[in-house]
């Protein structure tokens, strides 16, 4: 049976994961139904503030859900050969208005972040 162990990541390690990965899983709450979508993102660190920039079409379930509930969670993985680093981000999302037919920028302001490095041993 495989054995799983992990160690907590510090802030610098978590930021390295966010810089090294390019895909996040964005979790939203659509009423009583969870809704998760993969999204590309861009990291911005401004002083002590961490922001994640996402781009989305202006119409659709994702933007409609964000307009009703701005609290989000993102899960970002950075796999390696012997381990996998994972960062969970909790925050609030804001979206701008777009011109018709244009993409909307969604900015997630990070309120809480945690990270782990997972090691799996096959026994």
Where are the predicted features?
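Extreme N-terminal tail/first-helix region
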Residues: 1-19
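Short solvent-exposed loop/turn micro-motifs enriched in small/polar/acidic residues
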Residues: 19-21, 34, 86, 101
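Short beta-strand segments
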Residues: 21-57
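General beta-strand recognition
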Residues: 25, 49-53, 73, 107, ...
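Short, electropositive, low-hydrophobicity segments enriched in small/polar residues
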Residues: 31, 95, 119
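Short, structured beta-strand-loop surface elements
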Residues: 58-104, 110-112
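Short, charged, intrinsically disordered terminal tails
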Residues: 117-123
């Amino acid at each position: 049976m495989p054995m799983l162990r992990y160690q907590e990541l510090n802030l610098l390690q978590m930021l390295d994961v966010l810089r090294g990965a390019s895909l996040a899983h964005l979790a939203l709450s659509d009423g009583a139904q969870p809704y998760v979508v993969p999204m590309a993102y861009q990291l911005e660190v401004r002083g002590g503030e961490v922001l994640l920039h996402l781009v989305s079409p202006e119409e659709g379930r994702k933007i409609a859900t964000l307009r009703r509930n701005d609290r989000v969670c993102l899960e970002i993985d950075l796999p390696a050969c012997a381990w996998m680093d994972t960062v969970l981000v909790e925050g609030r999302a804001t979206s701008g208005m777009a011109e018709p037919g244009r993409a909307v920028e969604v900015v997630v302001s990070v309120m809480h972040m945690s990270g782990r490095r997972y090691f799996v041993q096959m026994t």
